[in-house]
Regions:
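Single conserved hydrophobic/aromatic residue that forms the stacking wall/gate
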Residues: 1-10, 377-387
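Extended amphipathic alpha-helical scaffolds
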Residues: 13-59, 64, 245-376
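Gly/Lys-enriched N-terminal cap/neck module of very large, oligomeric protein machines
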Residues: 33, 39-42, 123, 158-162, ...
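Generic secondary-structure signature for well-ordered alpha-helical cores
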Residues: 77, 111, 115, 150-154, ...
Length: 387
């Protein structure tokens, strides 16, 4: 019995692929084949004592689907930092604010790397398994997601990588620790492919535009070697991917030509109408005329190309006539008005209007008893900032 178990263990080890990738003064470790084997692809990424597992699962598209159902979920487990959830509830509940924001952080650079024709369902699940006090998990999660997507048999035009950039003592710092971030004038996360920056997220003190642009370029330059290493890792795991091509390419070109011929004149007139409501009515009229007489099963195909024609006309107007939809030139700002004390019994209120967009904004003052506190994973203190 033990011999069989040993043979299974040896066989399992043969399927494990591990790669160590230098990144500045730190090392990113990618490993696959050990955990979550039933997923389409899974990767465990670690940097120091911070470990994130990412599992990607795909499902064939439903008939008639015309959008890409990609969902990204990032989850933090309190055991990762050796802590127990505080308060009345001792189990993890709904996603925290940081989990939601990190999920979006991962989603934004992944989504543009899929072709428009790909509509299979894709779920990306990242879970923080271990956390040290030197390596924030969001960048590690981004790398894990990129690596997992790269070894999945999907038309992912990656890989991509990410880097955190700090600015301490007039110098850029790559992937600063939590302690270094407390001293930094900049907390920027940059993600991108080898050829382009795909996402930038930052908090900063007052820094010049040149310093901010320099931070983006610095982060992108530092991640390029990592992208090549992730690509090598992916090719070792999955030497060849399936040949993904758009099966409806010729048909879509034909429909686009038909829609363009029928709708360009009406849409061009609509996009010179400055009133938003009237413009919407004209666009709806053109759309109804297009769909009139078509079989219902063709509606989605024609509506998709209708959107493409809309984008083409708006783009041509901006580049050619240097005018936006509402008649403004490219440097003109909408009319702005502000009315304060908009609500009589509220501590502070304002009505902000810009063009046809409005916002009612309120402020309420409270005492120290009203502060929201939450347990920090990285220290024994409680944070009085929103979490």
């Amino acid at each position: 019995r033990s011999l069989v178990g040993s043979e299974m263990c040896i066989r399992d080890r043969k399927n494990i692929v591990r790669k160590e990738i230098p990144m500045g003064s730190k090392t990113l470790v990618l490993e696959t084949g050990k955990i979550a084997r039933q997923a389409t692809a899974s990767v465990i990424a670690s940097m120091g004592g911070t470990v994130v597992m990412c599992a990607v699962v795909t499902k064939p598209s439903a008939e008639g689907r015309d959008f890409f159902p990609l969902s990204v979920h990032y989850m933090e487990k309190t055991y990762a930092a050796g802590k127990i959830p505080g308060g009345y509830f001792k189990r993890e509940g709904k996603p925290t604010e940081i989990e939601t924001l990190t999920s979006r952080l991962i989603d934004r650079p992944l989504r543009p790397l899929f072709p428009d024709f790909y509509v299979d369902e894709v779920q990306v699940n990242c879970m923080l398994l271990s956390l040290d006090k030197d390596n924030p998990p969001d960048v590690v999660a981004l790398m894990a997601a990129s690596a997992a997507m790269s070894i999945a048999d999907v038309p992912f035009r990656g890989p991509m990588a990410a880097a955190r950039v700090g600015f301490i003592n007039d110098e850029y710092v790559l992937n600063p620790s939590f302690a270094e971030m407390d001293e930094s004038d900049l907390d920027m996360v940059v993600a991108g492919s080898e050829s382009a920056v795909l996402m930038v997220e930052s908090d900063a003190n007052e820094l010049s535009e040149d310093l901010m642009i320099g931070a983006i370029l610095y982060g992108h330059q530092e991640m390029k070697p990592v992208i090549k290493q992730i690509d090598e890792f992916a090719k070792e795991v999955l030497p060849e991917k399936s040949d993904f091509t758009n099966p409806n390419e010729e048909e879509e070109k034909k429909i686009f030509s038909e829609v363009s011929e029928q709708c360009t004149a009406g849409l061009s007139e609509a996009f010179t109408t400055t009133d938003k409501k009237e413009r919407g009515e004209k666009i709806s009229s053109v759309k109804e005329a297009l769909l009139d007489g078509l079989d219902e099963e063709l509606h989605n195909s024609y509506l998709k190309q209708f959107k493409e024609v809309e984008k083409h006309i708006v783009r041509e107007n901006i580049l050619g006539a240097q005018k936006r939809i509402d008649g403004r030139d490219l440097t003109e700002v909408r009319n702005i008005s502000v009315e304060t004390n908009f609500l009589p019994s509220v501590h502070g209120s304002a009505l902000f209007t810009r063009g046809e967009t409005q916002a009612i904004v309120t402020a309420t003052l409270g005492s120290g008893r009203d502060i929201q506190t939450c347990l920090l994973y990285t220290s024994d203190a409680a944070d009085d900032w929103f979490c």
